[in-house]
Amino acid sequence: MEVPGKMTYRPRLLLFLFGILPSLGAEYKSDNFRVEAPSSAIAKELGEAAEQCRKEQALAWLDKELPPWPQPCLIEVRITLDGRGGCSTFAFDKGKVTSRSIVLEGSLETLRTNVLPHEIAHSIFADYFGCPLLRWADEGGAIVSGCDTDGRWYNKLCHEITNTPGRSMLLRRLLSCRDYPDDVTALYAQSYSLVKFLVDSKGKPAFLAFVSRGMQDHDWDGAVRAYYGFHSVEQLERAWLREQKEILLATPLLQRGSTKED
C-alpha cells in the first residue's frame, strides 16, 4: 500500500548474485544495526564492522559523526559460494529516513571489504539528502567508498565505454539521470569516474554540497561554477575526460588488463 508523502527507495544490486542462499540463523544487535547471519560469529563480526564503517564514512563525507539512528538498520547476511551483491532499502518522510535495511550476499571477506562499505555509503547519503539521490551520485559515491580494486576496474571500464560510440552518456544527461538506464554497467563506470574526479578535486563534503545545490535548482552550470570553478558542465566534462585518459596512460599494463574480482 502506498502512503502519501512517503517514498521507498531500493538501489539496484551492485552485481548479479549467484549461489545458494543459506538460512539466517543468528542475530547480533548494536547501537545502530541488527544483523541476521548464518552464525553468531559472522553476525557479530559484520555488526561491529558496520558500526565502524558508519563512523568512518560519516566523518569522511560529512566531517562529523552521525547521531544514533532512531531505529536500527536491519542487515541480512547471506554467505554464498560465488558472486557478490548488496541492496539497500530506505523509506523517506518529510526529509528524513524513517526506515532502512540492507541485504549482503557473498563471501565473508568480500562482504567486509567491498559490499558493506558500498551499502553503508548509501545510508550516509540517505541521511544527508533525506530523499532518493540521483543515480550517478549515489552509485558513484558508494563505489568511491569501497575498495581500490573496484575503483581501478571501473576506471578502466569507463575509458572503454567513453571510447565506444553511442555507449557513454554526455555529462549533462548523466547529472540529471534519476532512473537506471538499460546499460547499467556504463552508468556505474561513468559515475565512479566522475565522482572520483570531483572528490579528488575538492573533497567529499564539497561534493555532497555540489550535488545538493544541483538537485535543488537544477542549475548544474551554476553548481559547477560555485564548487569547482568551471564555466559550464561541458568544460567540467572536458577536464574530467582528459584526466581519465591521463590516469589510464599512467596505469601499468598489468593493472589495466586486470579483471574485477567477485
Model-derived regions, located:
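N-terminal secretory signal peptides that target proteins for export/translocation
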Residues: M1-Y9
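Sec-dependent signal peptide recognition
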Residues: T8-F16
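Acidic/His/Gly-enriched intrinsically disordered linker/tail segments
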Residues: T80, T89-S99, S107, L111, ...
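Hydrophobic h-region of N-terminal signal peptides that target proteins for export
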Residues: F16-G25
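A detector of low-complexity, intrinsically disordered, Ser/Thr/Gly/Pro/Ala-rich segments
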Residues: G5-K6, F18, G257
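Juxtacatalytic substrate-recognition/specificity segment
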Residues: G25-L134, G151, W220-A223
